[in-house]
Amino acid sequence: MTRKPTMKTFAFALMAVAGFAVLTVGWDAGVASVSASSDKGRKLHVTKECSNYSGTAGSFCTITSSNLNELKVGSTVFYDQAAGIPAGLLDSNVVLDAGDGNRAVGRCTLELATGLGLCTFSDGTGEFAGFNARVRVTPPDDGENWHWEGTYSFD
């Protein structure tokens, strides 16, 4: 005995095909976004001197070199919170100010005993609009210049 296709069978088949198409398109979009995002990370190398950093809120360091055109020598990094809260750490919001309204906002966490830490930046204004960065902080090997090494991108 042969069954005739019914409207229910046709609707089920149509739903299965549509579902497969949605999954295929979604998969392709996901793959594209992953490969695009991996292309965005560029290397960031920065040095800064911190003779004006006292550990109090509002202290700052000055950029002495950078491979990023937007981050000019003489730009300042302001630390909003005091060091030592919590004990043994600097954990502070930061503003990277390159002048003329070009600023990036982020956060730095640093172990005071070793000088090792991490800074992340999530956006900005002016030339730093859409700026994202993740940098490893290392203490001065020359007694003066702190180092940021990591990656950056612009949305």
Place the predicted regions along the sequence by residue:
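Bacterial N-terminal signal peptides that target proteins for export
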Residues: 2-14
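A detector of low-complexity, intrinsically disordered, Ser/Thr/Gly/Pro/Ala-rich segments
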Residues: 4-7, 22, 45, 60-62
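Bacterial N-terminal signal peptides
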Residues: 13-26
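Beta-strand-enriched cores of mature, soluble protein domains
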Residues: 30-155
